[in-house]
Amino acid sequence: MRKLEVSEQITKEAKKIISEGEGETQEVIDMCDFATGLSRQLYGLTMPSERPNHRLQEIWQPLGVVGCVTAFNFPVAVFGLSLI
């Protein structure tokens, strides 16, 4: 239900047509769904690297408060991607 409200706000602020506002809102929803799925796959694995004497390690490190400067043409999509 909030999707339409967010889409309308994007349309007003970014001077877009409503279908573009809805598309951008759906894009952020899809990004959040994808990130939620990725969080379930974080096991703290240690893997070999292609670089000699290096290893890859999955570590969960919350960032805390984050600021984001977004482009005018895709304000919500850029913000959503920054959250992930």
Question: Where do the language-model regions lie?
Answer:
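Conserved small-residue-rich beta-alpha loop and adjacent elements
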Residues: L45-I84
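N-terminal Rossmann-like NAD(P)+-binding subdomain of aldehyde/semialdehyde dehydrogenases
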Residues: M1-H54, I84
